UniProtKB/Swiss-Prot annotation:
Residues 215-254 are annotated as: Disordered. NCBIfam families: PS_II_psb29 (TIGR03060). Keywords: Coiled coil. GO terms for biological process: photosystem II assembly. This is Protein Thf1. It comes from the Bacteria. Belongs to the THF1 family. InterPro entries: Thf1. The keyword Transmembrane helix does not apply. May be involved in photosynthetic membrane biogenesis. It holds the Pfam family ThylakoidFormat.
Length: 254
């Protein structure tokens, strides 16, 4: 019997793959997402699916927005996926494919896919994905799966997420169609939106602080340049005066 990997094992693997330091504000985001992915990966009932992939990719992109240097985000995401035995390219490709599928489906088709026992016209692919989840008695629900479904709905019908009443009605239909806990999913998504808002506020404060620091640094550099210029002018003036004095003294000696 193989030994179940621990959170420590996964974190160690992650930091082996990604060796650059991570900004302290974002380190908690990365580690919390990594732990969540790890716990699912070692759960016997968990099965990877495109909605989960979309949830992972969306969470990472939304919470890591504003990370610097931007190039490090690629390494961080790849290392997270590698640490749990996953493939970053597969996550991104499956997430992108699901987004494209969402854009091809109308709001009516979405609703019918979650309500009907047969696929509605033009939505066979989506219906099959939903049906596979609904018929899985051991389906492992997760917050990341919920975020994936939420993102999918938003890509198909953005106004669904802007109107609280319509959003709740749609989530009721979705959870019923997937045989998932409605209240749990709604609470998870409420927390997701709340955390996003808090993160955006933190980033705004950070950007303001960086702007102030940048202005202070630019002012200091400008003042330093001005002082250097003044010193240069003063030196040149003194040199000219010395030359004139020497010339005058030479003339007197003559």
């Amino acid at each position: 019997m193989s030994q179940v990997r621990t959170v420590s094992d996964t974190k160690r693997d992650f930091y082996t793959h990604h060796t650059r330091p991570i900004n302290s504000i974002f380190r908690r985001v990365v580690e919390e997402l990594l732990v969540e992915m790890h716990l699912l990966s070692v759960n016997a009932d968990f099965r990877y699916d495109p909605f989960y992939a979309l949830g992972v990719v969306t969470s990472f992109e939304r919470f890591m927005q504003g990370y610097r240097p931007e190039a490090d985000k690629v390494s961080i995401f790849q290392s997270m996926c590698q640490a749990i035995g996953g493939d970053a390219n597969r996550y991104k490709e499956d997430a992108m494919a699901l987004v494209e599928l969402a854009k091809r489906c109308s709001g009516t088709q979405l609703i019918e896919c979650f309500r009907q026992d047969v696929p509605p016209e033009g939505a066979q692919e989506l219906w099959e994905k939903i049906e596979a989840i609904a018929k899985n008695d051991h389906f492992k629900y997760s917050r990341l799966f919920a975020i994936g479904v939420y993102t999918f709905l938003g890509e198909s019908e953005p106004q669904l997420l802007e109107d609280t009443e319509k959003r709740d009605e749609m989530l009721t239909t979705v959870t019923a169609g997937l045989n998932l806990p409605e209240e749990k999913m709604k609470k998870d998504l409420d927390l997701y939106r709340s955390n996003l808002e808090k993160m955006n506020q933190v980033l705004e404060v950070l950007e303001d602080a960086l702007a102030v620091e940048r202005q202070r640094r630019e002012k200091a550099e400008a003042e330093a340049k001005a002082k250097t210029a003044e010193a240069t002018v003063a030196t040149e003036t003194n040199d000219e005066q010395d030359e004139q004095k020497e010339t005058s003294e030479s003339g007197s000696d003559a």
